[in-house]
């Protein structure tokens, strides 16, 4: 996939902007609070229907305006598409090639974006739910079926928990079947994804720094290295049976993929406890790169890689190594307060000042 143009109307500090992007590296630089990150946010909103900066999209409406409008023209497999979103106080309207999209599950995967930002530190330092969310979002971008599976799993989980609180054993048993069916599939897909990500991750990391890194999916449902879906389902059935009394005492379901963990280690030690800030940000950047490679290799999906405020997250040596890796990832958009070296592999350099974007190099696209 390649974004050809991005149009913003009354979005954040942009009144009216049309930006043409280059096919490879696009470096956007300028002072703080000029509108650099807003451009990445716009791409992210088009991808997922939500922002990485605020829980309310209406916060992104320019002061004094009634709504914002974002539109991207992009090509996928040599076919041109248009995706737009308009947000006002009443809600949002999303159009793909002129046809309305009414559910976010229909949007995810149409316009895949992988974002690296300083907020990614939550993947390492946050709760296990942050790491589960990381895997779920990656799998959702690969397949809309996964979005359906995870949604049905949480529906079954909510219903089973309600039955537990009501002490209704008959209803608990009835909800065990869908819980096992969807939960086993979620755990299986997460585990397979993690194994493939780990292989890619280690290859990319070996190309940059010399520490030994590892990703591992930890689940009580997975007791062997390469379990089948039936193996996981059998384990889930047995664990629910054993935990039934304890579930009734506690008032909720103790076992399942909603309790699983993605473990990140460096030199066999937990990254969260035994890594420097520089190592953590480097790891996260390579993890985002691994996502891109995973989508390309497994699903022939070529997402846009967006990297926000790269000089704030990474030292120059690590940054140079990572940017060298990015050459093979397709279209990349970065932001920084520092103007990149014009002699580097950067294909397009843009300067942003007070929501005005100018092309610095090359002179024309």
UniProtKB/Swiss-Prot annotation:
InterPro entries: DNA-binding_RecF, DNA-binding_RecF_CS, P-loop_NTPase, RecF/RecN/SMC_N, RecF_2. The keyword DNA repair applies. It is found in: Cytoplasm. The keyword Nucleotidyltransferase does not apply. One of its GO terms (molecular function) is ATP binding. Keywords: ATP-binding, Cytoplasm, DNA damage, DNA repair, DNA replication, DNA-binding, Nucleotide-binding, SOS response. Pfam families: SMC_N (PF02463). Its main location: cytoplasm. Belongs to the RecF family. The RecF protein is involved in DNA metabolism; it is required for DNA replication and normal SOS inducibility. RecF binds preferentially to single-stranded, linear DNA. It also seems to bind ATP. This is DNA replication and repair protein RecF. It comes from Chlamydia trachomatis serovar A (strain ATCC VR-571B / DSM 19440 / HAR-13).
């Amino acid at each position: 996939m390649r974004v050809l143009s991005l149009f913003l109307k009354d979005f954040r500090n942009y009144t009216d902007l049309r930006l043409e992007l280059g096919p490879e590296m696009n470096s956007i630089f300028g002072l703080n609070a000029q509108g650099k990150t807003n451009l990445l946010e716009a791409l992210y909103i088009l991808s997922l229907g939500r922002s990485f900066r605020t829980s309310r999209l209406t916060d992104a409406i320019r002061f004094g305006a009634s709504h914002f409008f974002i539109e991207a023209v992009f090509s996928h497999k040599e076919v041109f598409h248009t995706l737009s979103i308009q947000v006002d106080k009443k809600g949002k309207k999303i159009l793909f090639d002129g046809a309305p999209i009414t559910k976010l599950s229909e949007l995810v995967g149409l316009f895949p974006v992988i974002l690296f930002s300083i907020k990614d530190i939550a993947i390492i330092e946050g709760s296990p739910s942050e790491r589960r969310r990381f895997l779920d979002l990656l799998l959702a971008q690969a397949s809309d079926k996964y979005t359906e599976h995870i949604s049905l799993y949480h529906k079954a989980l909510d219903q089973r928990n309600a039955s537990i609180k009501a002490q209704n054993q008959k209803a608990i048993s009835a909800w065990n079947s869908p819980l096992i069916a969807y939960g086993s599939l979620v755990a299986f897909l997460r585990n397979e994804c993690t194994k493939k990500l780990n292989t890619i991750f280690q290859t990319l990391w070996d190309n940059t720094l010399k520490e030994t890194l590892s990703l591992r999916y930890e689940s009580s449902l997975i007791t062997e290295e390469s379990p089948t879906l039936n193996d996981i389902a059998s384990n889930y059935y047995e664990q629910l049976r054993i935990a039934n009394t304890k579930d009734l005492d506690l008032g909720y379901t103790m076992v399942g993929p909603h309790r699983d963990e993605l473990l990140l280690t460096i030199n066999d030690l937990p990254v969260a406890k035994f890594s420097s800030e520089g190592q953590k940000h480097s790891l996260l950047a390579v993890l985002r790169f691994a996502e891109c490679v995973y989508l390309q290799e497994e699903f022939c999906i070529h997402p846009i890689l967006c990297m926000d405020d790269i000089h704030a997250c990474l030292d120059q040596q690590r940054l140079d190594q990572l940017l060298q890796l990015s050459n093979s990832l397709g279209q990349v958009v970065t932001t920084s307060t520092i103007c990149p070296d014009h002699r580097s592999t950067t294909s397009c350099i843009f300067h942003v000042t007070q929501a005005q974007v100018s092309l610095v190099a090359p002179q024309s696209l």
